[in-house]
Amino acid sequence: MQRPEEYQKLFKYFDIKDLGINLNIGHLNLASKAFNFSKLKFVDMLKPYITAIELSHNNGIEDQHLPLKRNEWYWKIINDPDFSKVYKILEFRNTNIKKIKEVFKFFKNKQ
């Protein structure tokens, strides 16, 4: 499922207590460009169902699984107080420990 309307149909069949969503930030970036929808409005719609957020950066064209960068659109989601207790999953490929430590500093400093 990639489009907001697909999730709206799903929510008609499942209660919040029966369904948890792992929001993949990289996939969200790709889908929002492919299907022309607002990332932040989409997250607001999913918010009650989000139990985890999978984190990676990409160029909006392909799923690159790059480390997070400063001052990007997704920090508003990551730092949303409603997600303070939601699991954050790092999904970086071919990333050295130095770069991972840098990303952790972003988290400490709220980016």
Q: Language-model features: where?
A:
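Histidine-acidic metal/acid-base catalytic patches
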Residues: 4-111
